[in-house]
Amino acid sequence: MAIIPDKQDNTVLERQEQKLKPPAMFKVVLLNDDFTPMEFVVMIVQEYFNKDRETATQIMLKVHREGRGVCGVYTRDIASTKVEQVVTHARQAGHPLQCVMEEA
């Protein structure tokens, strides 16, 4: 707490410490389906989540084997944007790939 003198009327103001919480974080998750090609999933992970080919392939295999895979953890706005971008790109390419966000 800092004490700040007020020069106009000789009162002393106390500055309250602000308590800021870190923003809520959200996982961006790809969901498996039987129609989207594995290579397309790898390309999506590389393009929208800035992963190298090896990491993107590992995420794709996790999606394929376990039904879901986390691509990254972001603030709400960024996660929402990434979900929208991935789903839009998949639909434009004719694939039913699903992408969702979940609280981390």
Swiss-Prot record:
GO BP of this protein: protein catabolic process; proteolysis
Gene3D superfamilies linked to this entry: 3.30.1390.10
Transmembrane segments: none
Organism domain of life: Bacteria
Subunit field text: Binds to the N-terminal domain of the chaperone ClpA.
Its biological purpose: Involved in the modulation of the specificity of the ClpAP-mediated ATP-dependent protein degradation.
Family: Belongs to the ClpS family.
Protein's UniProt name: ATP-dependent Clp protease adapter protein ClpS
Biological source species: Paraburkholderia phymatum (strain DSM 17167 / CIP 108236 / LMG 21445 / STM815) (Burkholderia phymatum)
